[in-house]
C-alpha cells in the first residue's frame, strides 16, 4: 500500500483490512517517485529530504519557506499508530531531516520503506535518542515511563500517546484546537489524550467558550484498532469462525467481540467505572481547565475496525438551541457537521475512516434537561485524530511557536 505526497513517499506493509477501510483516503493516491533529496544518507539516522511545512492553526507568511528540518524518532513505528504517523507526516509534508524507526526487540531488523530508503527498525533503548529533535511515542505506558526521561535528557522533545504522563501536573495534555497555548509550559514532554477524549473536547470547546458547560454524559463506541493489531486480527478471525459455524476463540478480550458489544474498555476499578472511563473524565477536565466539571462516561468496545463513535449529552450554563450549537461547531477547525435526518445523513465509522476531521451529527435538544441541553453524535478516526494526527498537529504547533 502506497501513500503519496509531494516530496516524501512512504510504503508500509499493512494488512488488507486497512486497505479496505481506508478506501476514502487512498482513493486519490498514486505512485510517484520523489523528485530529489535535501541531503546525503548519513548513519545512524536514515535521512529523508526536506519537505514543506503545514500547520492547520497558524498562518505562515505567503512566499516564506521554513528551512528548519528535524531529526525524528518514532517509537512503536511498526504499530498501527506509528504507521499512521508516517503516512500523515508524508501527507502534511512535515519537515523531517532524519528518521529513526524504533520498536521492541521483536521487530528489530524489519525493514520499512520510507522514500528511497528501506529503513531497518531498531530496538528502542535509552541510548536511541542521541541527535534526535523530536520523538513520537506510541508504545505502552511502561515503555514511555522507561524511555522518555532518557530521550528528554538527550535533548529531544517527546510527544507521548500513552497514559504515562497525561495526568502529571507539569506535563501539557493537548488537543491543538482547544489548548495549544499549554504547549509553552512543556519541559520536554507533551501528552496526547486518550482517543475518545480528543474529539469530545474538540467538539465541545467552541461552545464551552461562550456558554460554559455544566455537565457531560458520554457513551463511547470504540473500535478494536484502539486496542491494537492483535485485536484487529482477533475480530477478523472470530468473524470467520462464527460464519463457518464454529465457536469464537477469544485471546485479546474477555469475551467474543465479533457480532457482539463489550461494555468494558480496560480494567474495572473499585468505583465500578473502568480505567478508560476515568481517563475520559479526568482528561476532559484537564484539557478544558475545568477541574470540577461534572463528567460521566460509559465506554463500549464494538466490532468495528476503525473509528470511535460517541453519543454525547451536554448541559450548558445558559439556554442553547440546536441551531446555535450547530453554527458554533461548524465554524470550529477540524470539525465537519453531517446532520440531515430527512435524508439519513449522519456520520458513521465506515464513512469517517481515513478522514482527519471529527464528524458531528444527530444534533438536537436534550429532552431530559430542556433548553440548556444538547444531545449529539460524533465520530472520528481513532488512529488519525485520536492519535497520530494529533501528534503531528502538536509538533507543527511547537515549530510555529518556536518551542522545539
Report the location of each language-model feature:
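N-terminal Rossmann-like NAD(P) cofactor-binding subdomain of oxidoreductases
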Residues: 63-257, 292-294, 327, 358-359, ...
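Short, positively charged and aromatic/hydrophobic N-terminal segments
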Residues: 18, 53-57
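Cationic, low-complexity basic patches in intrinsically disordered or flexible, solvent-exposed regions
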Residues: 30-33, 43, 61
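Low-acidity, Ser/Thr- and Arg-rich intrinsically disordered low-complexity segments
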Residues: 3-5, 15
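Charged docking surfaces used in two-component/phosphorelay signaling
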Residues: 135, 224-404
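Residue-identity detector for glycine
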Residues: 7, 36-39, 52, 63
Amino acid at each position: 500500500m502506497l501513500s503519496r505526497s509531494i516530496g516524501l513517499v512512504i510504503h508500509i506493509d499493512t494488512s488488507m483490512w486497512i486497505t479496505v477501510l481506508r478506501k476514502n483516503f487512498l482513493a486519490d493516491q498514486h505512485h510517484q517517485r520523489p523528485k530529489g533529496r535535501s541531503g546525503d544518507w548519513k548513519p545512524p539516522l536514515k535521512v529523508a529530504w526536506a519537505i514543506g511545512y503545514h500547520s492547520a492553526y497558524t498562518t505562515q507568511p505567503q512566499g516564506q519557506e521554513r528551512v528548519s528540518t528535524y531529526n525524528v524518532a518514532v517509537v512503536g513505528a511498526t504499530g498501527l499508530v506509528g504507521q499512521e504517523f508516517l503516512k500523515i507526516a508524508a501527507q502534511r509534508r512535515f519537515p523531517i531531516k532524519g528518521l529513526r524507526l524504533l520498536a521492541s526487540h521483536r521487530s528489530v531488523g524489519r525493514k520499512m520503506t520510507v522514500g528511497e530508503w528501506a529503513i531497518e527498525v531498531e530496538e528502542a533503548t535509552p541510548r536511541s535518542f542521541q541527535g534526535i529533535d523530536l520523538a513520537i511515542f506510541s508504545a505502552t505506558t511502561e515503555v514511555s515511563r522507561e524511555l522518555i526521561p532518557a530521550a528528554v535528557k538527550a535533548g529531544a522533545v517527546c510527544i507521548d500517546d500513552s497514559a504515562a504522563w497525561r495526568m502529571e501536573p507539569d506535563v501539557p495534555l493537548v488537543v491543538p484546537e482547544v489548548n495549544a497555548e499549554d504547549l509553552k509550559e512543556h519541559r520536554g514532554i507533551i501528552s496526547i489524550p486518550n482517543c475518545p477524549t480528543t474529539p469530545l473536547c474538540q467538539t465541545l470547546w467552541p461552545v464551552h467558550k461562550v456558554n460554559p458547560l455544566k455537565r457531560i454524559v458520554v457513551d463511547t463506541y470504540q473500535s478494536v484498532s484502539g486496542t491494537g493489531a492483535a485485536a484487529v486480527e482477533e475480530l477478523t478471525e472470530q468473524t470467520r469462525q462464527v460464519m463457518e459455524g464454529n465457536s469464537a476463540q477469544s485471546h485479546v478480550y474477555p469475551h467474543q467481540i465479533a457480532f457482539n458489544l463489550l461494555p468494558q474498555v480496560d480494567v474495572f476499578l473499585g468505583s465500578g467505572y473502568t480505567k478508560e472511563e476515568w481517563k475520559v473524565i479526568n482528561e476532559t477536565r484537564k484539557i478544558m481547565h475545568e477541574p470540577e466539571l461534572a463528567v460521566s462516561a460509559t465506554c463500549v468496545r464494538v466490532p468495528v475496525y476503525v473509528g470511535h463513535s460517541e453519543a454525547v449529552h451536554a448541559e450548558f450554563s445558559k439556554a442553547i438551541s440546536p441551531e446555535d450549537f450547530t453554527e458554533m461547531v461548524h465554524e470550529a477547525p477540524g470539525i465537519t457537521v453531517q446532520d440531515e435526518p430527512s435524508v439519513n445523513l449522519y456520520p458513521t465509522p465506515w464513512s469517517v475512516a481515513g478522514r482527519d476531521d471529527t464528524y458531528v451529527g444527530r444534533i438536537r435538544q436534550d429532552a431530559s434537561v430542556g433548553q440548556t441541553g444538547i444531545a449529539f453524535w460524533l465520530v472520528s478516526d481513532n488512529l488519525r485524530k485520536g492519535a497520530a494526527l494529533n501528534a503531528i498537529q502538536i509538533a507543527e504547533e511547537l515549530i510555529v511557536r518556536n518551542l522545539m
